[in-house]
Structures are given as C-alpha cells and as structure tokens.
Amino acid sequence: RGNGRINAKEAREIAEQKRQRVGLKPEISELFPSELSGGMQKRVGLARAIASNPEIIFFDEPTTGLDPIMAGVINELIREIVVEMGVTAITITHDMASARAIGDKIAMIHNGIIQWNGQITDLEKSNDPYLIQFLNGSSNGPIKLTS
C-alpha cells in the first residue's frame, strides 16, 4: 500500500486509472489547476488521495466552495470510493449535509474537546446543548462567538 517506488510508466498508468475512477475526462490531464472548475479540482484531489491505495484518507472540508449540486456529487463519489476501497475516512467539515452523506460516526469538537460523538443516525436524538446549537445554527446556547 503505497510504500514502494514505481517507475514513470507505472505512475502514469496509476494516474490514468484514478483519473477514470473519479470521472474525469482524458483532456483534464493537459490542464493546469487554475484551468479546472472547483468540482474538477476536488476530483483531482480525490484521485491523488487514492493513488497510493491508502488505508486511511483524510478529507478537509471536501465540499467547501462548491454549489449544493456539485457538493452532492463529490459526497457520493467519496462515499463510493471509501466503501469500494474498504478504507477509513476521517473528514473535517462544517457542512452537515456532507457529514450526513459520507459519515457513519461523527464527533463534534469545540475548543479542542470532543463535545459529542456517536453514530450519524443519533445526531438528531442528542440532548447535548452544544450539538443542538450547532445543528440549529443558533446564536443562543453554550457556544459563544468572539469577535
């Protein structure tokens, strides 16, 4: 899993396989990052993340900057790949739609402390005031905003 050296030909073959897996057309290989749309950039990032067949994949705000439709497409792609590869995914996100779409377990961290954790299906059942405030997007509650 990603700890051996490969030659240039093998690297190109892997890049081609991963490009196809994330649904990008061959022409994309000739473009600079600045020439790609936000959704294409996210797909390229995902292809790079899976190129070495990792056991764990970290996602940091995977849908930031995307419209809701493209965010849904990226969420579905992440979920498919995680299941297909049988890997562990750790995702940092403020996007609860994304968290619900790709997560099985979730933890809410506030001021560096795990405030709540559990199954994604238990989110709405929680009585934790921090979680309730966050889910509702309320300014009232234990989470105080600082300027």
Language-model regions, residue ranges each:
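Conserved ABC ATPase "signature" region
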Residues: 9-27
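Conserved ABC ATPase signature
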Residues: 32-36, 40
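Conserved catalytic motifs of ABC-family nucleotide-binding domains
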Residues: 53
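Catalytic Walker B motif of ABC-type/P-loop ATPase nucleotide-binding domains
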Residues: 57-60
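Helical segment within the ABC ATPase nucleotide-binding domain
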Residues: 72-85
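A short, surface-exposed alpha-helical micro-motif characterized by mixed small hydrophobic
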Residues: 99-101
